[in-house]
C-alpha cells in the first residue's frame, strides 16, 4: 500500500463522524428493492434533479454491530477504478446511512453464466482481465475484498465488469495477517477454513481461481452434501478440471487454487500468465478517472443555472466530499455521455409538452432550481471523514445453520447443483467477541424493515425547490443534452426506461 493511501486512511480515522442530518427523500425518489443483505437493503432510486437511476444501500446504525477498522463507505471512497462500483454520495440520518452508488445496467456474473451455461475461453479472458485489473488496484491501495463471488460481480451490457459489495472488505498493511474469518464457504481459501491467520490479498487470489473455474465450467469446483465434506475438499484442494480446457488455462486455475498460500501467486504475477496475456496484454487503465478532479466547464455552467456554485462544484470534486454537489455533477456527466453515445434518430414530439430551453436561451433559466441560503446542503462528507458503519452481505432467506464457536456462522445445506449452491452460499459477516456485542433485544430491530417507514424516511418536499420539480428535471436533462453536438435538440430523453438488474 502506498504512503498516499495510508495517509488518506489516517485522515479518514482522525476526523470526527459527520453530524448534520439530511433528508434523503428531498434528493431521491425510492422505486423499489433490488437486493437484500442481512440487515442492509439495496434500493433502486431516481435522482430527482437528473432523472438518473442509482443504487442505494441502506445500512441501519445499531449499537451492537461489529465495528470494523474501516467501513464499506470508507473503502469505496478510496476506490476510483473503472471496474469497481463508484460511490457518489453518502447521507446519514439518525437511524440509517445511505450509500448512493452508480447503477449497473446489466446482470450479475452468476446470472450471466447461468444464461450461457459456461463461457468460451476468449470471453472468459476478457472478463477475467478486468477482474485482475480491479483486484490489483485494490492490492495497491491495501484493500482486500474477502467476498469475491459471481453475485458480487456485475457484467454490464457493454461487457464491462464491476465489482460490488465491499461489506466484508478491509484495508491492510503489507505483510499484515488477518484473524477475522468471513466470506462465502465454497469460495473460501483453505487457510480461512483452518482458522489460521491469513494474508488478505492471497485469499482474493484463491477466490479469483474459484470464479474463473465457474466462468469456464458453469459450476463451482468444490461441492458436497455437508459442510464437513466441503471443508475437507477445499482444504485438500481436490477438484476436477474438464479436459476440454486448454493446457494454459488448466495451469492457471491450478496456480490460483494452490492450497499453500505461500506458493500462491500474487495478482501481479497472475497478470503476466500466458493464458491471461494471450491475444492482447492490455488491461483496463486504472488511471481512468471515474470521479474527475477538474470539472467540465460546460457542465459547471449548466449546474450554475440551477443554483450550484462553480467553486463549490470544484471543491466537492477535488476533495471528494461525496455530497449532493458531487453526486449531481457525476450523474449529469454520465447522462451526457450516455446521450452522446446514443444513435441519432428522430423522435416524435409530444404536443402537450413545452419545448425544453437551451443553454443559450438565458431568459428561460432565470427561474432555475435554486437553493435557499438557509437550506442545509448535502452532508459534507469528504474522503477523510469517518463512518462507524458495518455493511454486510448475507442471505435474504436463511437455512439451518451451525456456528463455529466465536467465529462465524454458515449455511449447512451445500449441494452440488448450481442453483442450490447459489441459494445456499451466502456471505457471512465478521463475528468476533472483541468487536461485537450482541444485543439481547435485537428481534424488534430486525423487523424494522417490515413495518411502516419511520418519519425520517417518509418523502417530504425539498425546501427551497419550486413547484413543478419534474419540469425542472426535464429542463436540466435537455440542457445537458444541448452540450452534446450529436443529439438533436428536440429529442426526448429515454432515461430510466432500460431494464436494470439488481445488485446485491
Curated annotation (Swiss-Prot):
Binding site for ATP: 34-42, 57
SMART domains on file: S_TKc (SM00220)
Biased composition (Polar residues): 376-393, 443-454
Documented EC number(s): 2.7.11.1
InterPro entries for the chain: Kinase-like_dom_sf (IPR011009), Prot_kinase_dom (IPR000719), Ser/Thr_kinase_AS (IPR008271)
Molecular-function annotations in GO: ATP binding; protein serine kinase activity; protein serine/threonine kinase activity
Sequence similarity: Belongs to the protein kinase superfamily. CAMK Ser/Thr protein kinase family. Smok subfamily.
Protein name: Sperm motility kinase 2A
Species for this entry: Mus musculus
Amino acid at each position: 500500500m502506498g504512503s498516499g493511501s495510508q495517509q488518506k486512511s489516517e485522515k479518514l480515522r482522525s476526523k470526527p463522524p459527520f453530524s448534520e442530518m439530511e433528508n434523503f427523500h428531498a434528493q431521491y425518489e425510492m422505486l423499489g428493492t433490488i437486493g437484500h443483505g442481512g440487515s442492509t437493503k439495496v434500493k433502486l432510486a431516481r435522482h430527482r434533479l437528473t432523472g438518473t437511476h442509482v443504487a442505494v444501500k441502506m445500512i441501519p446504525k445499531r449499537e451492537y454491530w461489529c465495528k470494523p477498522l474501516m467501513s464499506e463507505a470508507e473503502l469505496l471512497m478510496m476506490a476510483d477504478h473503472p471496474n469497481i462500483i463508484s460511490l457518489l454520495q453518502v447521507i446519514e440520518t439518525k437511524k440509517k446511512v445511505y450509500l448512493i452508488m452508480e447503477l449497473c445496467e446489466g446482470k450479475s456474473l452468476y446470472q450471466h453464466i447461468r444464461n450461457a451455461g459456461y463461457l468460451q475461453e476468449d470471453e472468459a479472458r476478457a472478463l477475467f482481465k478486468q477482474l485482475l485489473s480491479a483486484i490489483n488496484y485494490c492490492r495497491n491501495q491495501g484493500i482486500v475484498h474477502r467476498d469475491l463471488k459471481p453475485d458480487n460481480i456485475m457484467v454490464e451490457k457493454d461487457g464491462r465488469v464491476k465489482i460490488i459489495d465491499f461489506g466484508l472488505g478491509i484495508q491492510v498493511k503489507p505483510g499484515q495477517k488477518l484473524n477475522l474469518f468471513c466470506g462465502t464457504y465454497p469460495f473460501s481459501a483453505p487457510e480461512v477454513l483452518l482458522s489460521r491467520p491469513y494474508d488478505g490479498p492471497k485469499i482474493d487470489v484463491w477466490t479469483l481461481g474459484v470464479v474463473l473455474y465457474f466462468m469456464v465450467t458453469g459450476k463451482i469446483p468444490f461441492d458436497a452434501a455437508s459442510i464437513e465434506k466441503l471443508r475437507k475438499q477445499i482444504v485438500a484442494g481436490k477438484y476436477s478440471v474438464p479436459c476440454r480446457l486448454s493446457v494454459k488455462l488448466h495451469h492457471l486455475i491450478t496456480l490460483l487454487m494452490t492450497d499453500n498460500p505461500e506458493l500462491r501467486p500474487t495478482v501481479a504475477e497472475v497478470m503476466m500468465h500466458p493464458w491471461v496475456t494471450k491475444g492482447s496484454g492490455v488491461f483496463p487503465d486504472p488511471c481512468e478517472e471515474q470521479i474527475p478532479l477538474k470539472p467540465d466547464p460546460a457542465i459547471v455552467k449548466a449546474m450554475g443555472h440551477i443554483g450550484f456554485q462553480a467553486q463549490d462544484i470544484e471543491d466537492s470534486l477535488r476533495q471528494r466530499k461525496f455530497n449532493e454537489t458531487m453526486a449531481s455533477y457525476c450523474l449529469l456527466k454520465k447522462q451526457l455521455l450516455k446521450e452522446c453515445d446514443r444513435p441519432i434518430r428522430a423522435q416524435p414530439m409530444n404536443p402537450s409538452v413545452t419545448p425544453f430551453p437551451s443553454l443559450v436561451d438565458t431568459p428561460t433559466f432565470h427561474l432555475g432550481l435554486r437553493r435557499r441560503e438557509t437550506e442545509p446542503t448535502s452532508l459534507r462528507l469528504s474522503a477523510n471523514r469517518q463512518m462507524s458503519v458495518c455493511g454486510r452481505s448475507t442471505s435474504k432467506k436463511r437455512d439451518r445453520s451451525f456456528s463455529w464457536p466465536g467465529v462465524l456462522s454458515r449455511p449447512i445445506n451445500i449441494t452440488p447443483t448450481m442453483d442450490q449452491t447459489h441459494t445456499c452460499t451466502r456471505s457471512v459477516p465478521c463475528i468476533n467477541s472483541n468487536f461485537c456485542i450482541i444485543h439481547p433485544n435485537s428481534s424488534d430491530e430486525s423487523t424494522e424493515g417490515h413495518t411502516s417507514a419511520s418519519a425520517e424516511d417518509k418523502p417530504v418536499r425539498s425546501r427551497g425547490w419550486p413547484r413543478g420539480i419534474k419540469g425542472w428535471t426535464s429542463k436540466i436533462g435537455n440542457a445537458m443534452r444541448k452540450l452534446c453536438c450529436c443529439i438533436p435538440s428536440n429529442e426526448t430523453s429515454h432515461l430510466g426506461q432500460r431494464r436494470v438488474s439488481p445488485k446485491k
